């Protein structure tokens, strides 16, 4: 995608920026991916005069499927996501941009009425997205058992709903679900890739 005057230019066609583009990323609300996508929309698409909306999905793979349907659909993926390597290999996708956006603060969150003690880490199961779990290792030096879910926001929701007691999550999800941090770790320095629909040409 190239922003040129009043159009979005691909190799084969130009689209008026009056058309709405969609930025797809991982949901639900409260994910670090949503935070990064909103940052991208504010600092890139709006400044370029491009009309855009945000669409949240359960998996990055679902985001990519939407992107493959139209050159006006894009997907933002963090480089911490292990499955991103497959997206780079696909001939029907193209890497359009890489940008940095550090995540919100990460920490261990519990319900306000839950009585947390540090020794719980030796036996408790912590609900988390797979990507940030090494924060526990580096900051607590403990070998913790995890219950893995699709996003940090989903982890926080499980604690809010009483399905788990401790979540590794971010500040946005903590606020959204009314949890409190019992430990804070760090805002994770992160880079992100923006993918668009590729243009495949047969070579015979």
UniProtKB/Swiss-Prot annotation:
Location within or outside the cell: Cytoplasm
A single GO BP: antibiotic biosynthetic process
Entry keywords, A to Z: Antibiotic biosynthesis, Cytoplasm, Lyase
Superkingdom of source: Bacteria
Alphabetical list of SUPFAM superfamilies matching this protein: Periplasmic binding protein-like II (SSF53850)
Catalytic activity: prephenate + H(+) = 3-[(4R)-4-hydroxycyclohexa-1,5-dien-1-yl]-2-oxopropanoate + CO2
This enzyme's EC code(s): 4.1.1.100
GO cellular component terms listed in the entry, alphabetical order: cytoplasm
MF terms in GO: carboxy-lyase activity
Purpose: Part of the bacABCDEF operon responsible for the biosynthesis of the nonribosomally synthesized dipeptide antibiotic bacilysin, composed of L-alanine and L-anticapsin. Bacilysin is an irreversible inactivator of the glutaminase domain of glucosamine synthetase. BacA is an unusual prephenate decarboxylase that avoids the typical aromatization of the cyclohexadienol ring of prephenate.
Protein's UniProt name: Prephenate decarboxylase
Organism: Bacillus amyloliquefaciens (Bacillus velezensis)
């Amino acid at each position: 995608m190239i922003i040129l005057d009043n159009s979005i230019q691909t190799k084969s066609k130009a689209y008026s920026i009056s058309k709405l583009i969609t930025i797809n990323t991982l949901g639900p609300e409260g994910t670090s991916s949503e935070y990064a996508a909103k940052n991208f929309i504010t600092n890139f698409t709006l400044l370029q005069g491009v009309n855009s909306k945000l669409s949240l999905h359960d998996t990055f793979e679902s985001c990519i499927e939407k992107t493959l349907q139209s050159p006006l659909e894009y997907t933002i993926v963090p480089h911490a996501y292990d499955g991103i390597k497959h997206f780079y290999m696909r001939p029907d996708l193209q890497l359009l941009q890489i940008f940095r956006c550090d995540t919100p603060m990460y920490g261990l969150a519990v319900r306000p009425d839950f009585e947390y003690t540090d020794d719980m880490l030796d036996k408790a199961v912590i609900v988390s997205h797979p990507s940030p779990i090494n924060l526990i290792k580096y900051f607590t030096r403990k070998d913790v058992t995890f219950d893995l879910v699709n996003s940090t926001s989903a982890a926080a929701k499980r604690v809010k709903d009483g399905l788990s007691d401790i979540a590794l999550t971010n500040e946005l999800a903590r606020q959204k679900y009314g949890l409190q941090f019992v430990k804070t770790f760090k805002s994770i320095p992160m880079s992100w890739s923006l993918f668009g629909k590729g243009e495949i040409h047969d070579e015979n």
